A protein has these predicted regions:
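ATP-dependent carboxylate/acyl-activation modules
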Residues: 1-275
Length: 275
């Protein structure tokens, strides 16, 4: 920590989530905004100012009072933009001298240099009345080799890139999780709902609320769709490609629906389920 007041328990929890997500994004391009350990905006852009603005556009309301983590060095132009929003913590791979001067104008804003942060192998510990459970964190970075195209329609190279991006982000969203994305930027995130259909509707409504509809929309789900209704809702909202884990007794129905609607569908053998 190089500036700001003392970190709280919740700050540390959010910082870990933000650092972990930003480190999973393409190096030198990634920005993530986290609120209550959930990402509310994620983007990967070569232009750092655009990366932040794109992440913020996903849900600027939820971003208020959140944490921003960038896997690149913050310079003065971005610092000026960051100071326009109330934030608890900003994490980056360093800050140039002008950026520090600008950001220090807010005396309580916590600035963290995460340059030397390495995740390594991490474990999650959960205590309960009669004991403790330990499991390794879900940190694998997914690539093209981890997915199988099961629809007749094949993804374009752009769709595949966005699908991989969305699925990698999806693992950090509390289940049931749905991530809508375009151009390596989230445009709608539905999280923490007992019903996967409800998470679909939340993601869609967020996208519409902030006018982020696009012709190049893809969606990722952290687990399989138990019924057709979820993917149907996504396709009706403009989604043209979907990635989801397989394993449902209705997988064939999902594939048939994708083919009937000319939708790209990819299956993964791995579920996320963040709790």
């Amino acid at each position: 920590q190089i500036h700001g007041k003392q970190l709280s328990y919740n700050n540390y929890n959010d910082i870990f989530s933000a650092l972990t997500i930003s480190r999973s994004l393409p190096k030198g391009k990634g920005t993530v905004i986290v609120k209550h350990a959930n990402p509310c905006g994620v983007s990967a852009k070569n232009d750092h100012l655009e990366s932040y603005k794109s992440a913020l556009s996903c849900d600027p309301v939820s971003a208020f009072g959140g944490i921003v983590s960038c896997n690149f060095k913050i310079k003065s132009d971005l610092a000026v933009e960051l100071n326009k929003l109330f934030l608890e913590v900003i994490i980056a791979n360093g800050f140039d001298s002008n950026a520090i001067k600008i950001l220090k104008a807010k005396k309580n804003l916590r600035l963290i240099d995460g340059t030397n942060y390495t995740s390594g192998e991490l474990f999650k510990f959960v205590s309960f009345n009669q004991g403790i459970m330990i499991q390794s964190e879900d940190l694998n970075i997914f690539s093209k080799k981890n997915f199988k195209v099961v629809s007749k329609r094949k993804p374009t190279s752009k769709q595949l890139k966005d699908l991989i991006f969305a699925f990698n982000v999806c693992r950090y969203v509390k289940s049931n999780a749905i991530v809508l994305a375009s151009n390596e930027t989230t445009v709608g995130i539905g999280s923490g709902q007992p019903s996967r259909l409800d998470s679909c509707e939340i993601a869609i409504n967020k996208m519409k609320k902030f006018n982020l509809q696009t012709d190049n929309l893809v969606a990722a789900s952290d687990a399989f769709f138990p019924f057709v209704d979820g993917i149907e809702k996504l396709v009706q909202s403009g989604v043209r490609a979907v990635v989801q884990p397989s394993g449902s007794i209705r997988d064939k129905e999902i594939i048939n629906f994708a083919n009937e609607t000319n939708t790209v569908l990819l299956f993964s053998k791995t579920r996320h389920f963040r709790h």
